Amino acid sequence: MRFKISALRSSIQIVSFLFLFGWASVAQARQDVVKDQFEVRDGGTLYLDLDYGDVALRTHDENVLLITMQRDVDGVSDGELKDMLSRQDYRFERDGNDVIVEVEFREDATDRAWKRWKRDYDLDLDLEILIPERFNVEFRTGAGNVELAHLIGNVSGRTGAGNLEFDAISGTIDITSGAGNIDNSDTDGDVNVESGAGTVDLEGIRGRIEASTGAGNINASILDQLVGDSSFQTGAGNVVVYIADDVGADVEGRASLGNARSEFDVRTRGKFISKSFSGRINGGGPAITMSSGVGNVSLRRN
């Protein structure tokens, strides 16, 4: 009798293990990887357009552009993954010395299976593109992060919702995020960055700077002499600008509802809840304008 009970317990354990193993094999993450490459020359442009996904742009010293697109879905079978990915169109194409990368889902609001999949499953799309060091980039994403480093070329684009991170760029930058943070450092060229709602961090920019956010803080470190007028503006948040002692500028700061402070010897004014300062620092130079609708404005020594 004791043997029968022990055997029964073992059978239950085996069945339980098989059930759990079978469930895990069905529910495990499914992955699909697509790769392509194109021969290009210096000075071309990457045109990137996708509705969803994170983008990592890397550079190298070869005249080839390499694309790796990885798509992951949790909790689906191979058949379900194949069906869902068949609804996603993508195009990798060379046009002269330029490369076009487009990724887009064909959404059908009347398709019940599509609506269920959108509700129950999470698709992760990661796009990694290796480009020549001397290249230009134009991008548009509906939602997703974009990062790029060590490029000699111009960058422009926007994401509807996502963070933008750019480092060591020799060229102009003109980027926008509808809702996300922007981090830009070590840039030789004019910079225009805008976020609808997010923090903007800038450091080591050697060019004109136009930085704005609808709701968020702006932090900037100016380490080298600017070559043109610059402005930092937030609708709701704090603006903090650090300036090195050998950088000359004509500065003006205004907080409509908040405080305005400067560690440099400038003229300050206060009227009711509005505060401001203005003056010439380190012998003067290009204009630096700082403003906050609701928040504080600070000018500090670096």
Question: What annotation goes with each model-predicted range?
Answer:
Residues 2-302:
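Intrinsically disordered, low-complexity terminal regions
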